Amino acid sequence: MKKLYLAAIAGNLGMLSVGQFLGWTSPSLAVLMQGKDEGYPIHLTPQEAAWVASLPTLGGIAGAIICAVIINIFGRKNIMLFTVVPSIISWLMIAFATSLTELYISKFTAGLAIGITLTVTPIYLGEISPPHIRGNLTCMSIVAVNIGILVEFVIGPFLSVQNLTFVSLIAPCLFMLIFIWLPESPYYLMSCNAKEETINSLVQLRGKKDVYNEACNIEQFVKASLDDQTDFRELLCVPSNRRTLIIMLCLSIIQKMSGYQAILNYAQIIFDQMNVNLEGKYLTMILGVVQLIFTIICMFITDHSGRRSLLIISCIGTACSTAMVATFFNLQYNHINTKDITWLPVTGIITYIMMYALGLSSQPFTLLSEIFPMNVKALGSMIILITKDFFEFVVITSYLIIADIAGIHVPFWIFTACNFAGALFIFFYVPETKGKTLEQIQKELQRLSKQ
């Protein structure tokens, strides 16, 4: 099993790189909007900053589409290794950009890497993991993302934009050097009729030679899945697939409309508007640490508590937290003295991150890795990633505009409503998948679709 954990850790170095792309925005935008980095030739207006923050989501849509087209041709491992190319190109372009156009292109390229990575990594991890620890290993991806975010939050305020990008180059290079030696997904190998290679992959991943029964189960599952067509009709017309798609689409919208993207990208700016004694950059660091700690907690409890219960608790908790922030800014907007309750929005934001990390951060990702059948997994994942990126783009670009026109409290009230609605949807429609094999999950979805 050592090779399994090594494969999961190495594979998640790509997710750490995703986290660094996401985390770069908060400290860097604060510097570039205020013109504090004299050595960097680009300074941003609020509108330009919104585009820099949101362009990776458009690149992510393109990346998800590309990944869906090529993942079953080149395999999970090769596609994961390919993400190193746009990652390195993007960081180098950011470091040496001399115009706003070049910075825009670099962020779109970063989105390509993010979109491909977020599509292929959960598929790979879901297919190499045994059922009893699949939740832990897929949650590890979100831990890796949050480590990447924390690195940028901690060192970003103290480095120049260019030096920060050079540090960020380490993760994709390290990922390539380690991951190249690890095995391909046994499910993908079996789909290529490479039974001997499948057994070799399982031997490496399980650390034992007696993998014949598992290989036979994989062969039956892959054969049954691939006997069906791989197209939109199969995804939309088969009741269990359609139910799965609707569940994951709604979860994606709930996740992105919960407010996390606004808080992540504009954390330092939001904290600076609270008029608290501690500088925004230090509060942002605290935010990153809290997020990492609670994501690690989630990783260890997800296969005990279950995906569904964590999602419900997370939605209720984030709703209460954003309501606290909205209340403070609502009072401030109406010129009511808030001097004695400056603790309220800080508590709300930190509590939000705690509750988001416990469920909404990782559980949709875990479900994505296990809920689609083989024949429509790439197609379904592509649609989900496109939906996520679209709503992420909407939240990032509209937050500053709505906050400027109507007040900061308005977007936070919207986030509150979406989180409460999300808790209700999850309670009534999302199935529990903990401890089940991929085959058992499909049988359960087929049973639910007949009711």
What are these regions (language model features)?
Residues 1-197, 201-203, 224-451:
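Alpha-helical transmembrane bundle of multi-pass membrane proteins
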Residues 206-207:
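Short helix/loop segments within enzyme catalytic domains
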